[in-house]
Amino acid sequence: MNPQFIVYACPTGELAKQLETYWQLSREQCGANSAHNYMPHCTLTGFFYDRPDSASYYLQALEEAYKSAQNDLSLEIEIVNLVFNSDWHGLELQAQGVKELVRNFAQIETSPTRTEEIRLKDWLHLSLAYGFAPEKRSHLKQLAQKAIDVQANVGWELRFYQRANTVWECLRTWTL
């Protein structure tokens, strides 16, 4: 079976440390939820399948889109809000320049073996918790409010991942 590929923006710095602490505490105190299946990230594309040897096409296109964006766009990711809905907790994000970078990547990418379009994500967010038992909502909210400071120092990396079965491999990172 062909591997899946995906493009993420992942936090670094103090916020990343706070998110790791939250991940650990929420798992220990409330049990695993669907967010625990992934590292803290903002999804920029949907998963797409292609042959393992096609990764070079995507890496080349991302490199080209990144270099172009560095010259023309702001690649800042802004945390807009910490949100606690009944079935989803997370950070809502804004990043028009990053969205444009990924749109450019999808347009210039040339893999001859991919059979589906690369789906771009419009709603940018970082999930803290979802798929949790309703009775855990309040405790998860309290943990997040205590552990996460949305004003904390944060950097972001653009990352291209390959996932085969359950094994993730980051093939390349770029500093945003």
Stretch-by-stretch model annotation:
Residues G90-Q94:
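Short histidine-centered catalytic/ligand-binding loop motif
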Residues N81-D87, W156-E169:
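Glycine-rich beta-strand-turn "strand-cap" elements at beta-sheet edges
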